[in-house]
Amino acid sequence: MFYFLIIVLMVFQAIFNIRLRLFIWEKPEHAWLNRAPTVFRDPCLTFTILLPAKNEEDVYRETIQKVYDLNYPKELMQIIAICREDDPGTIAEAQAKIDELGDPNVQLLIYNDYPVSKPHGLNLGLQVARGDVVTIFDAEDEPHTDILNIINTTMIDGDIDAVQSGVQLMNHNTRWFCFLNVLEYFFWFKSSMHFFARIGMTPLGGNTVFVRRELLEQLGGWDENCLTEDAELGIRLSLSHARLRIIYEDEYVTREETPHTIEQFIRQRTRWNQGFIQILFKLEWLKLEKLSQRLLAFYVLILPEVQALFAILLPVAIIMFFFVKFPLWLAMLTFIPLYCFILSLFLDLAGLHEFLKAHNRKWKWGESIILVLAFFPYQWILSLAALRAVYREIKGTSNWEKTAHIGQHRSKIAA
């Protein structure tokens, strides 16, 4: 029975994950309905753009410039660079760029209080925000130049409270694990987010999220003690019946980079997993009205524990497969998870083709071979990060493990 339950759990998780990834292709009308507007309204809404940063000397100055260069009237934009006092390098880069721009609407907010976390900095930025709409870009982001026109038009036309636009990692071939990391983002924002929005339970992405300031203030801003403040805010927006819109087009994604080492990747994924665990035990998701919303929230938030469980049980399952005699029907059943993994692998190959085509890059058979070889090691890394997240949560460790950025998506390698 124990072995049977492991198999059922693995099969369910694999099939539902495949369902999420294929949703937008199964129902292409959702993609059409959530396209960016082709004709922009005259700029009307004002925007406050929060740029939190920590130890981002390598990328921050260029990011401030790229955000300032967005195709939108400068008098309708407020840009707030957010740094902590103990980060003189990033502060110096930000101040140098702000002095160069010479625009009073581009400001530097320096704080020295606690907690030391991204959402705390965001809340301080919210206190001085003047825009009708508040948004966040990460320190290495490259938003599309027309993103504010898109959001301005979308929010006015649909009387929308919040918009999640697409985010995409771009350096798919700089490290062996980058292929699958890039595809996670590709499927998540292109397909899965539309499924979440349809159900009415949307764990928001970390940036390129646009929320009306008054609503954000009513909700109390971001949870300063949560490691995934974006997803937690998404739950509260769903509870408040906010009118949320998902927009995804490959042309308009905000470009980012993957972590540049396996250690950085594990630390990043650990933080995300632990944040989901925090939200799970906060129990706010249980207040969602519909059973489908609560079940979906539970599935998304329980994934870290499921991955950790798989990491523990997989060796046990392998030992039992070779040394325990099973009935024929159960022995045949043990191959179903393998078939699901193979299907997921082919789906990743198809996703790589779609990603390359969408961003005008050439298909290379060598890259597809690397993806295939990396598939199972990548799953083990995810399981390790999940185990680490569970361990940290049990231990009571919740410090913010920062992901370093070096601008890989801005180099020729990422092309």
Give residue spans per PLM region.
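Catalytic donor-sugar/metal-binding loop of nucleotide-sugar-dependent glycosyltransferases
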Residues: 235-254
